[in-house]
């Protein structure tokens, strides 16, 4: 992907966080065909601190006994123009489609809501522990949380002190991030520590 992006733009316009090389772990982000990753523009920002992966059984299974969530990635960056630092955490929580051991409760959150909620709580705890070792409190959570705005995983992130960018700033002209079957909803949303 990086080669294609750089071919379409200019050499070295984009780079990626090589998680296995940075952590010394083979398949640190798992072996599934779907994995998280992090691309960036090295002309604007530089990775700093440790590349961190949350791939504990408790997080990946969400308490379900089988791998359900993708391992999470955290990387701190320093912006060249200002010297400011921030941490980006990329995530992909369990989808609503296939079943887990905990049945769909019929509350509208779909299958595996408890798995996503457990993962959101563990993610917030992990990020609070400074996994990148930079001591920087500015954290941006991105990726596919597979949860709508008022579902339990999202509420858990709010309780942990994170702010929903779409709600806070009314991005995208009306507060939605996903359209499916004619419904406009907030599904994949960035979260950040308040400043």
Predicted regions and their residues:
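Divalent cation-coordinating acidic motifs and surrounding scaffolds
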Residues: 1-195
